[in-house]
From Swiss-Prot:
GO terms for cellular component: extracellular region. Disulfide bonds join C24-C43, C38-C60, C62-C73, C74-C79. The keyword GTP-binding does not apply. Keywords: Acetylcholine receptor inhibiting toxin, Disulfide bond, Ion channel impairing toxin, Neurotoxin, Postsynaptic neurotoxin, Secreted, Signal, Toxin. Gene3D superfamilies: CD59. Belongs to the three-finger toxin family. Short-chain subfamily. Type I alpha-neurotoxin sub-subfamily. Expressed by the venom gland. Transmembrane segments: none annotated. It comes from the Eukaryota. It comes from Hydrophis peronii. It is found in: Secreted. This is Short neurotoxin 2. CDD domains: TFP_snake_toxin (cd00206).
């Protein structure tokens, strides 16, 4: 009985994937690609223009942005590249 219970617990943990983290890109503008592990389930890419040209910011989550900033949120690994 204990073996069956232990097996069920292990199967549940594997199926729920409790330790899952999402991988998001976090390089800025045209810098070489870098990634980070995120606890949440989304990545973002913010794009805007200023006196320097087009600026791109990437990271974890899906933040609120001011008007004039384009925001793309996505939900798969490295989807914000």
């Amino acid at each position: 009985m204990k073996t069956l219970l232990l097996t069920l617990v292990v199967v549940t943990i594997v199926c729920l994937d409790l330790g899952y983290t999402m991988t998001c890109c976090n390089q800025q503008s045209s810098q070489p690609k870098t990634t980070t592990n995120c606890a949440g389930n989304s990545c973002y890419k913010k794009t805007w223009s200023d006196h320097r040209g087009t600026i791109i910011e990437r990271g974890c989550g899906c933040p609120q942005v001011k008007s004039g900033i384009k925001l793309e949120c996505c939900h798969t690994n490295e989807c914000n590249n």
